[in-house]
Amino acid sequence: LFFCIDSDDQIIEGTVKKIIETHQGLQDDKFLCGIIAKKLIINRQTSQNLPNLKRSTLHDIYQTGFTGDTSLVFKTSVLREFPFPEIAGEKFVTEGYVYDQIDQKYEFLILNDFLMRCEYQEDGYTTNAASLYLKYPKGWALFYAQYYRFYAKSLRDKIKYMGHYISMCMFAKIPLFKMFNDSPSVIISLISIPAGLKFYKRFKSNASTK
């Protein structure tokens, strides 16, 4: 098993035992990739329960209206199926890129309990997300192009996620020909250029205030 822990996370007492006990229910199920549980955020007054389901993809959990943070435990064999891409000149790709691929094939066993606690730091990943867009735009362009392919159904969503893709290509200084060639849809790319320009200006402004 592989337990995803950030630098500002702390394992709650009894977590390893809970993981081992829950693992008994998933190790022989080839359609389960691991365990999803709750994460306790210390500097928040409330926390949400996960949906009352036995199993789900990570994406579908958030589609139910859940907005909390999660603790993820993966079967190591599943993670090996989905390696992170190597991008010249960049050293970061959001884990969401891999998680979305896993969601296309597997589900998580839901454990409606806390496995870790966290107090978000001012210099942490979540707080400084805007600066990551500027530092690693090629990786983010890959993420948004893939997210578009998997989840953009309505025209509004297509323009939104294509706009994000275009803005990241602009930060990466990717030539127009390559941007359109790698795009999930050339037509939607063309009509999403205004959205791309808007996101480009917003991310640049947000990063400059950090």
What residue ranges belong to the model's regions?
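Short beta-strand-to-loop acidic/aromatic patch adjacent to the donor-nucleotide binding site
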Residues: 1-10
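Conserved donor NDP-sugar-binding/catalytic core segment of glycosyltransferases
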Residues: 13-47
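Alpha-helical elements of Rossmann-like donor-binding domains used by nucleotide-donor carbohydrate transfer enzymes
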Residues: 14, 18-21, 97, 101, ...
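Conserved nucleotide-sugar donor-binding catalytic segment
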Residues: 41, 45-127
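Catalytic core of nucleotide-sugar-dependent glycosyltransferases
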Residues: 116-121, 128-153
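Structural register within alpha-helical repeat arrays
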Residues: 162-165
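Membrane-interface aromatic/basic loop that binds lipid-linked glycans or pyrophosphate carriers
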Residues: 169-210
